[in-house]
């Protein structure tokens, strides 16, 4: 297929976050699957996509998913303390429950009482992460207002070999993992990943005179098993299972020393098949996911207090047809059923959602076009229709423009709808409109882009202290901002810069809680002979927050902070690597949530062996 001038220019801009690894040859084209729900060259999509590869995870020596995601453009992490504690994010000022999280292309079940807790997803079985900024509800449905994060596991990897990794670090941190890909006969591939990690933590919620000396630790055990069978060049079958058991500790209240533990268990199974010909690709997947959450006082034990169960079942059928060198059509059907069991109230709630979507993409000379439409039918809140259209034009080989406009929505979660005390079955989805305009180019070896975005969100769902339940807030919240990104090299150093400036206001014109108006990030990699040196810097400006330990609750402002992390990997041989990482290199004192100090400077050492 002959590529347009615009596609060639976009290909140079849509490089993975892997810093154009100076010590290895690059693939001819970066391929993405999340932008339009089918595999395509990055140069053929108008979406803003960033990619984290497994090599990036190894080079940065990140220990948690939030440590990786905070390097991405427009991402701001909020965390209630250290490893394992509740972690959420904002993308372009939209909240965690307005960002869709996928695992292998399937919606990850959200905790019944809120959004995805990013600290609970282990890195052991992560192979790649694709991050799409901007509304994508016309493809995926609910939650895809601010963007989509697709965590792609090793379940369908074709890479063979075994890697063993062991490490230790500050706060009595220990980790051990093994990942292996093995050929089964001539047409099969088995993938296995096992991991365990723990630390004793620190006092994530210090209250002088009440819990002095407390340490709030974390432990995670996780596993993945995947199998792929290629019957012939066109037809394949795949199946996988993944699980984790995470336990973390915290204090029950501000005024009493009531030590508590929370346990989060997750188990999922997937089976699917794919047919692929020269022009047509069709894939069918069936997935079931079960989550169990316990919250109990340590002295009384696991079954003394509350527990919640959440089950989610998905069927997904996606098709893509390449009409000719210009036009591509895609579409599919999604079905999801969710069950929430509240053990405290001894009640079970269930709802289902059926959806169909269609996409058309065109690539002709200096033009790129994308248009998508989706219809969702939910048994509780009715139907939603969302759309998106994007257009790009290349003026000259080194300069282009693209624009998009779309609609999106976020459905109430199961807790907000069904909780016996605080739920409201009459809640309606939040709805949003988004518009973006982007200029990009290549100048003197610098790849750059500047994007303006504007989100208008209505019917925000929030707790109402007067009615004592969740209600839709009347009025319109507005988030508008500008992003600037740049990639360039100075000698053997590869640089990535991003600037995010935004105003995120509620319907009364007040800044939305915990959103920073200014963020600056710099990521760099030095790859020289047998050594990789990675460094990451971020500045997060002042943010409004609430002090829940006062009555009535007081408005406060969290201080701005700068954070530096660095890591070094030394390749002793082709099979042995020794790595070290320092978190919070400058030992800054800061909070991303009021009353929850972040960890002090921490050191980590790791050794990996491949065979």
Curated annotation (Swiss-Prot):
Q: Where is this motif: TonB box?
A: 29-36
The segment(s) forming the TBDR beta-barrel domain are 159-611
Question: Where, by residue number, is the motif TonB C-terminal box?
Answer: 594-611
The cellular component terms of Gene Ontology attached to this UniProt record, alphabetical and capped at eight, are: cell outer membrane; pore complex
**Where does the signal peptide begin and end?**
1-22
Q: What is one Gene Ontology biological process annotated in the Swiss-Prot or TrEMBL record?
A: monoatomic ion transport
Q: Which UniProt keywords apply?
A: Cell outer membrane, Ion transport, Membrane, Porin, Signal, TonB box, Transmembrane, Transmembrane beta strand, Transport
Q: Which Gene3D superfamilies match?
A: TonB-dependent receptor, beta-barrel domain, TonB-dependent receptor, plug domain
Report the membrane topology from the UniProt record: Multi-pass membrane protein
Cellular compartment(s): Cell outer membrane
Which GO molecular function annotation, any one, does this entry have?
A: porin activity
PANTHER family to which the protein is assigned, alphabetical:
COLICIN I RECEPTOR-RELATED, TONB-DEPENDENT OUTER MEMBRANE RECEPTOR
Q: What does this protein do?
A: Involved in the active translocation of vitamin B12 (cyanocobalamin) across the outer membrane to the periplasmic space. It derives its energy for transport by interacting with the trans-periplasmic membrane protein TonB.
Name the protein family: Belongs to the TonB-dependent receptor family. BtuB (TC 1.B.14.3.1) subfamily.
Q: What is this protein called?
A: Vitamin B12 transporter BtuB
Lineage of the native species?
Bacteria, Pseudomonadati, Pseudomonadota, Gammaproteobacteria, Vibrionales
